[in-house]
Swiss-Prot record:
A Gene Ontology BP annotation from the UniProt entry: diaminopimelate biosynthetic process
Taxonomic source organism: Chlorobium limicola (strain DSM 245 / NBRC 103803 / 6330)
Gene name in the database record: dapA
Protein name: 4-hydroxy-tetrahydrodipicolinate synthase
Compartments where located: Cytoplasm
UniProt-listed PROSITE patterns: DHDPS_2
Length: 296
């Protein structure tokens, strides 16, 4: 493990729903126990993979409290709490902190495409409103705009509780700049399972992973092997699971991973609109891969 606060293998946790689309807290507790047993370092509920845009603030609070109660002090809980309206993002962050989150993952403002100064002011307002560590989530493919390395580094230097970035830009030049120029206590994590091996080899601190929902032990071993320079071992793990990493995005996340978890008997296959079940052909492809890995 890195000496930085935010590091290792973090799971971007799904939100299990019952058939009536209400939150299934029984399944949620079982998922938390699954990750404790697997050695996952951080659980992140209420993020993109947790269908956060469809959750009410009351549901966000209940999910975070449930995860925190089940996790206790065995595993860090860093909750998703972001949106594109700054005042609402502040409200979500304060709500997550009150519910017991030990850190907050806050997605960059989306759709309205603010300038870099606007992005800076957005995160500055959040940092001033809460005391827990904040993870910036940069995912241009979903938000429509990139948080520049210079903006991330400025925030990291100006605010002690801006502790990390989940970098999902696939921009290796930006990742390199962040790793080389960051403050000593600032963590850089990848949001791409397919990039864990090269990212860790470059000096990254960990991953916020979708595949960790299905194979948490494997993701943990991959991160640790790559971090400690056991590259042959890391390559072997990566080779075994890289097709699963890719198939988790055969359609929009979290649809494939929730289908997989349903096949594994861990949750019901229920989504909230506008997400809908996988196409039949994609179900067949993903199921075959899960069978080849011995997961179903």
């Amino acid at each position: 493990m890195s000496t930085r606060l935010i590091s290792g293998s973090a799971v971007a946790l799904v939100t299990p729903f019952r058939q009536d689309c209400s939150v299934d807290t029984v399944a949620l507790r079982q998922l938390v126990r699954f990750h404790i047993a697997a050695g996952t370092d951080i659980i992140i509920p209420c993020g993109t993979t947790g269908e956060s845009p469809t959750l009410s603030m009351e549901e966000q609070s209940r999910i975070i409290r449930t995860v925190k109660e089940e996790a206790g002090e065995q595993i860090m809980v860093a909750a998703g709490a972001g949106t594109n309206a700054t005042d609402h993002a502040v409200e979500l962050a304060k709500n997550a902190e009150k519910a017991g989150a030990s850190a907050i993952l806050s997605v960059a403002p989306y759709y309205n495409k603010p300038s870099q100064e606007g992005i800076y002011q957005h995160y500055a307002r959040i940092a001033e409103a809460v005391s827990v560590p904040i993870i910036i989530y940069n995912v241009p493919g979903r938000t429509g705009s990139n948080v520049a390395a210079s903006t991330i580094l400025r925030l990291a230097r100006d605010f002690g509780n801006i502790a990390a970035v989940k970098e999902a830009s696939d921009n290796m030049a930006q990742i390199t700049e962040l790793l080389e120029e960051r403050p000593e206590n600032f963590s850089v994590l990848t949001g791409e399972d397919m990039l864990i091996l090269p990212f860790m080899a470059m000096g990254g601190d960990g991953v916020i992973s979708v595949a960790a929902n299905q194979v948490p032990s494997a993701v943990k071993r991959l991160v640790e092997a790559a971090r400690t320079g056991r590259l042959d071992e890391a390559r072997a793990i990566n080779t075994r699971y890289r097709r699963l990493f890719r198939l988790n995005f055969i359609e929009s996340n979290p649809v494939p991973v929730k289908y997989a978890l349903a096949l594994m008997g861990m949750i019901e296959e229920v989504y909230r609109l506008p997400l809908v079940p996988l196409a039949d052909e994609n179900k067949r492809i993903l199921k075959e891969e899960l069978q080849s890995l011995g997961l179903v």
